[in-house]
A protein has these predicted regions:
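Amphipathic, non-transmembrane alpha-helical secondary structure
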Residues: 28-35, 39, 249
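Short, ordered loop/turn segments at secondary-structure junctions
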Residues: 54-55, 83-85, 211-213
Length: 258
């Protein structure tokens, strides 16, 4: 039996329009909901219960991490985790049965279940880089899709003389980067180039973007539309808000507190 849980951080990390009407559980509410799912699956006859969750093991996500959830429920046999991009087949000194494959399809998670004992026999990660043989049919289909993407988004829109930093940390989530500067400068340019009349002087116009939304590097040379879409894949909208300077400082301090 499988059940899923999403990190409550989602409600502050995604476009509000996309989650309108949804409620994200946290703390005891999330634990209780998980226990209800486990009990329901057990009563329906499930021999093994696996949680497919996007909670992670970052300390900053406490008290809503996968390891805290596991420790506070009963009857959960295994967890497949995400969010923190951790590479692991178990967690902590007490070896909690939590698997996470990292990120960017670098690993494939494998779970072996013994049909006779109805128990999880083993779990492992397969390093994708070790898989060197191509399946001809899959490769042909992939090349077909890649060709369509290149035809639509492979055109050059700009050039750069330097590499533009797409790293997470240290990088766009922890400090100023040239790619973060370029993106926010572009946001300001777009607003000033539009027909929108701003009610503040130009020197009071600033741009803020979510560091977690910057997903890749752009390397020296041509910049294609595909490269831009790879860096900014979420299709967010540009919004204008008027805030007092004190609130802006508060927002910046909140984003740098850790």
């Amino acid at each position: 039996g499988f059940f899923g849980l999403e990190n409550p951080e989602t409600q502050t990390k995604t476009n509000p329009a996309l989650i309108k009407g949804l409620k994200f559980l946290s703390r005891d509410e999330m634990t209780n909901a998980a226990q209800e799912q486990i009990d329901s699956l057990k009563s329906d006859g499930a021999d093994i219960i696996i949680g497919i969750v996007h909670l992670g093991v970052d300390k900053s996500s406490e008290p809503n991490t996968s390891y805290e959830l596991y420790r506070n429920v009963t009857g959960l046999d295994f967890m497949i985790d995400g969010h923190s991009h951790t590479v692991m087949t178990e967690y902590g000194e007490d070896k909690l049965p939590i698997q996470s494959t990292g990120s960017n399809f670098k690993n494939i998670g494998v779970i072996v279940i013994d049909n006779a004992t109805k128990e999880i026999e083993s779990n492992a990660l397969i390093d994708v880089s070790t898989l060197t043989e191509n399946d001809a049919a899959v490769e042909a289909k992939a090349n077909e899709i890649i060709a369509k993407i290149d035809a639509e988004f492979g055109y050059v829109v700009a050039k750069t003389d330097v590499d533009l930093n797409g790293d997470k940390a240290p990088g766009n989530r922890t400090q100023e980067t040239n790619l973060g500067d370029l993106i926010t400068d572009a946001m300001i340019w777009k607003i000033k180039d539009s027909e929108i009349a701003l009610s503040v002087p130009d020197e009071n116009v600033v741009a803020i973007t979510n560091g977690g939304g910057i997903r890749a590097w752009i390397y020296k040379g041509d910049i294609t539309k595909k490269a831009i879409n790879t860096v900014l894949p979420f299709g967010n909208s540009l919004a204008i808000a008027y805030v007092p300077g004190a609130e802006l400082i508060e927002a910046l301090e909140a984003s740098t507190q850790s």
